[in-house]
Amino acid sequence: MNLGEKLTEGKTKIVYAHPNDPTLAIIIHKDGISAGDGARRHIIPGKGALSGRTTANVFTMLNHAGVATHFVAAPEPTVMIVRRCVMIPLEVVNRRIATGSYIRRHPDVAEGTRFDPPLLEFFLKDDARHDPQISPEEIVAQGIASADEVEQLASESRRVFLLIEEAWAAQDIVLCDLKIEFGRDASGALVVADVIDNDSWRIWPGGMKERMLDKQVYRNMPVVTDDGLEQVRRLYEEVAHRTDAWVNR
């Protein structure tokens, strides 16, 4: 499809202006996968299409549930048309199960501890500083978002978490945690933006960590081999297939 000027490029996607509508943008999903703030990087042929399919399924479900998102359409597996936003440089994380970086930062908390309600954390998007955690007060003090917006980020991110948690629970899969991002649309309203795919969460079938289906499998590899990358691709394919059910029910 026709593309406008390139606006930005990250490790897993490229964002272009829409050639005909200044209120829209086009996201192209790439085949890259990375970990450790980009210290580990590989290409998995077909991953972009699988990530795009998962993201389109998630955003379609959220739109149908009345969540404000930037998603408009996905005309091709690797292509997503979205409302153009100014991104807020935060990762908003909700945690149901203590695992991953949380237990490294809180060694007194046992892995598998359940948070009810989900635990909310904010992280500043800054690869050079390894995305440091940031408090709501610091977010306001640094002018990243207003106090009212921080409350909205908290409430909307929890709403998104609970919707996705319910969808996974219907397949006997535990959503351990979820990382999402927000932007401001042309009117200044907050919307869920960026992507939500198999890089965005930890999911454990039957609540069993050893059966994980997500990007953590790639992170955990002591050495990355071609067979290992194919294993990751198959997991992403399974997750894309499973999320198809969220929009076909």
From Swiss-Prot:
InterPro entries reported in the protein's UniProt record: SAICAR_synt/ADE2_N, SAICAR_synthetase, SAICAR_synthetase_CS
Coiled-coil stretches are none
- Give the EC number(s) under which this enzyme is classified: 6.3.2.6
Recorded catalytic activity of this chain's protein: 5-amino-1-(5-phospho-D-ribosyl)imidazole-4-carboxylate + L-aspartate + ATP = (2S)-2-[5-amino-1-(5-phospho-beta-D-ribosyl)imidazole-4-carboxamido]succinate + ADP + phosphate + 2 H(+)
Q: Which domain of life is it from?
A: Bacteria
Pathway(s) it belongs to: Purine metabolism; IMP biosynthesis via de novo pathway; 5-amino-1-(5-phospho-D-ribosyl)imidazole-4-carboxamide from 5-amino-1-(5-phospho-D-ribosyl)imidazole-4-carboxylate: step 1/2
What Gene3D superfamilies does UniProt report for this protein, alphabetically?
Answer: ATP-grasp fold, B domain, Phosphorylase Kinase, domain 1
- Example of a GO MF term: ATP binding
GO BP of this protein: 'de novo' IMP biosynthetic process
Pfam families xrefs: SAICAR_synt
Question: Sorted alphabetically, which keywords does the UniProt record give?
Answer: ATP-binding, Ligase, Nucleotide-binding, Purine biosynthesis
The cross-references to PANTHER family, in alphabetical order and at most eight, read: MULTIFUNCTIONAL PROTEIN ADE2, SI:DKEY-6E2.2
The entry sums up its family as follows: Belongs to the SAICAR synthetase family.
This protein is called Phosphoribosylaminoimidazole-succinocarboxamide synthase
